[in-house]
Amino acid sequence: MERVFSVEEISDPFWVPPPPPQSAAAAQQQGGGGVASGGGGGVAGGGGGGNAMNRCPSEWYFQKFLEEAVLDSPVPNPSPRAEAGGIRGAGGVVPVDVKQPQLSAAAAAAATTSAVVDPVEYNAMLKQKLEKDLAAVAMWRASGTVPPERPGAGSSLLNADVSHIGAPNSIGGNATPVQNMLSGPSGGSGSQLVQNVDVLVKQPTSSSSREQSDDDDMEGEAETTGTARPADQRLQRRKQSNRESARRSRSRKAAHLNELEAQVSQLRVENSSLLRRLADVNQKYNDAAVDNRVLKADVETLRAKVKMAEDSVKRVTGMNALFPAASDMSSLSMPFNSSPSEATSDAAVPIQDDPNNYFATNNDIGGNNNYMPDIPSSAQEDEDFVNGALAAGKIGRTASLQRVASLEHLQKRMCGGPASSGSTS
């Protein structure tokens, strides 16, 4: 924020030291000439430059105030440097074009008569003019564009006003510096003039600075709100678009999550069904393993039974091998007594297929025949033989029965021979 400095805050080295004081007589003699030279120089300087810039009302008021203050000073002292110079401020010497109208003899007379006016009324008039000038300056500042900060801002009100004029509207022509006008009189008059200006400007300057700061704040807020509205609108649109995009992304994520959850539930159902099937297969495998062991045991049992059957068959086949030898022996002992009764008995001998009858007669033969070897027999062997014979389907049963019948006939004849001979004798 721009700060306006009062003239009282300016240090003494910025002002040009006043020339040594002169005597009162010389000052009175040179009073009229100083005013004329000052005014004439100003007019000449103003008229010399054809392209002089237009003055604002505040500058004219300030120029008139300085002229009246110089005319009101008791001891005016013209300076040879009255037409070349400027106000020395914080930023350097600022040349000010003091454009004054040509003073005629009537103006000089009016100036001399104005010095006789009552000082109190004149001070009140000056104060009123100063207030008007300050109000005009404040309005001019409020209407113009003021930069936020100026590093090289002037320390006095005049320096601030001149700095707002700008570089393009440069002062042309032979301008009459105000500093030389202030330093032209004696040292006491120059310092008193600066002090009077400080006293008159101090209070209004502070109030005008406050008004200026408030105006600047208001303008800054207006500019900020005016420029921030599009930015706020863009920001709101961006926020809205971000919210919508975030909402869409959340909806997409929720849909994807629901789909994944459905897939997970389906896979869990499939996994449970596969686990049940695996359990069933394992149970069947265990049952099959048990059945396999049972079947292996049955196979071993059957193998043992087959082996026993083979052994029994071998024994039976070995006994059958002896039957041909017995038939051979019967054929060798053919000369027996042939009686009709024996012949009829031999012819009437029935041939039975019952093997039990065969074994019964065989036992009798074994008990009475001393020529035949004893054939051991047992119920188990008989059973095995019968089972083997039945399993064989009675193959070759006719031949064996014929041999058995011939063997029985032979045994009967052998057994009946001694008995018949004993009875006959």
UniProtKB/Swiss-Prot annotation:
InterPro entries: Basic_leucine-zipper_C, bZIP, bZIP_plant_GBF1, bZIP_sf
bZIP domain: residues covered: 232-295
Region (Leucine-zipper): 260-274
Subcellular localization, as worded in the UniProt entry: Nucleus
Biased composition (Acidic residues): 213-222
Biased composition regions of type Polar residues, renumbered to the chain: 171-182
GO MF terms held by the record: DNA binding; DNA-binding transcription factor activity
Residue ranges of the TM segments: none
Chain coiled-coil ranges: none
Region Disordered, residue ranges: 1-50, 169-257, 334-354
UniProt keyword annotations, A-Z: DNA-binding, Nucleus, Transcription, Transcription regulation
Gly residues composition bias: residue spans: 30-50
Biased composition (Basic and acidic residues): 231-247
GO cellular component: nucleus
PROSITE patterns, per database record: BZIP
Region annotated Basic motif, chain positions: 234-253
Subunit structure and binding partners: Heterodimer with RISBZ1/BZIP58.
Stated role: Transcriptional activator that binds to the DNA specific sequence 5'-GCCACGT[AC]AG-3' found in the alpha-globulin gene promoter. Does not bind to promoters of other major storage genes such as glutelin, prolamin and albumin. Binds to the DNA specific sequence 5'-TGAGTCA-3' found in seed storage protein gene promoters.
PANTHER family in the cross-refs: BASIC LEUCINE ZIPPER 63
Protein name: bZIP transcription factor RISBZ2
Gene that encodes the chain: RISBZ2
